[in-house]
Regions:
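NAD(P)H-binding glycine-rich loop region in Rossmannoid oxidoreductase-like domains
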Residues: 41-81
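NAD(P)-dependent short-chain dehydrogenase/reductase
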Residues: 141-199
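N-terminal Rossmann NAD(P)H-binding glycine-rich loop of SDR-like oxidoreductase domains
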Residues: 1-22
Length: 311
């Protein structure tokens, strides 16, 4: 099996390089050209040429424009990367008879209510990021290519830029922390996303009728405030030198942190379909968060990195 992986230097892409390696020959690309191949989603023509050159059986697109607030001032670039490039990849996948695996977001929904969103619920994004990601989903679906679209939320890893690492940095620097407590979702590790992806690829080899959209998150739900408390408590128990304890994290409403792009209050995603179709049991969100913090704080991890406040 030949796999073309785009966005291989991102949080999810980094883990995919590990999880996909046993499945076949992986061509892992970043947005920079390498050996005449391009993984730059801002250049759909170069992407198409790369697909035609590699001739993969599976295309895994882990690249996206994910700077949510910046997309409000750069909507055309967001549309190019999040919508037009996936559309072109889908066309090439259809022509080549390849599968396209693509990652999307809870931001395709408006965040209303308190019930977990199902795949059949009508999308209604409230910001540019969500709208462009939805356009990418729709283009893939309309292309007729065999595909898996995984919607996920609150992605983190022990490396890269994410909420988990930001909280550790701030807890080492600040005397107090204020974190929003009225946005609810499930922190989902890049490691889990990559492992589920590899499992799904094995499944579609046997059952090509599994093409479609699936929600992929860790089990359970929490607020950003409670999430931050677990991060800090776990790091403190591991011996990390912090100025803030978990009990010092103050819950505040979202209105106290206005952002260019509005955030959904309800980011819950119902992963029942994924579990039933692929025969999976998804771990509790706390398990992955504790593991990621322990990876950072263990000897040889990023403890010194955070001590120097370099994020």
């Amino acid at each position: 099996m030949k796999i073309l992986l785009l966005g291989s230097n991102g949080q999810v892409g980094w883990e995919l390089k590990r999880s996909l390696a046993p499945l076949g020959a992986v061509t892992a690309l970043t947005r920079h050209s390498e050996k005449g191949l391009s993984g730059d989603l801002a250049d759909p023509d170069a992407l198409a040429a790369t697909v035609q050159s590699v001739r993969p059986d599976i295309i895994v697109n882990a690249a996206a424009y994910t700077a949510v607030d910046r997309t409000e001032s750069e909507p055309e670039r967001a549309k190019l990367i999040n919508a037009q490039a996936p559309a072109r990849l889908a066309q090439e996948a259809k022509s080549a008879g390849a599968w396209l695996i693509h990652y999307s977001t809870d931001y395709v929904f408006d965040g209303s209510g308190s019930t977990p969103w199902q795949e059949t619920d009508p999308p209604s994004p409230i910001n540019v990021y969500g709208r462009t990601k939805l356009e990418g989903e729709e283009a893939i679906g309309q292309s007729g290519c065999q595909h898996l679209i995984f919607r996920t939320s609150w992605v983190y890893a022990s490396q890269g830029r994410n909420f988990l690492r930001t909280m550790l940095k701030l807890a080492a620097e600040k005397e107090s922390l204020r974190v929003v407590d009225d946005q609810i979702g499930a922190p989902t590790g890049a490691e889990l996303i990559a492992d589920v992806t590899a499992h799904a690829i094995r499944a579609i080899e046997r059952e090509p009728g599994l093409s479609g959209t699936y929600h992929l998150t860790a089990a359970g739900e929490t607020s950003w405030w409670a999430y931050a408390r677990l991060i800090i408590d776990t790091a403190a128990k591991a011996g990390m030198d912090l100025k803030v304890s978990a009990r010092d994290v103050v819950p505040v409403p979202s209105k106290e942190f206005p952002t260019p792009a509005p955030r959904p209050g309800n980011s819950r995603l119902d992963a029942t379909k994924l579990k039933d179709v692929f025969g999976l049991s998804l771990p509790a969100w706390e398990d992955g968060v504790v593991r990621a913090v322990q990876e950072i704080t263990q000897p040889g991890g990023d403890r010194a990195f955070f001590r120097n406040h370099l994020l």
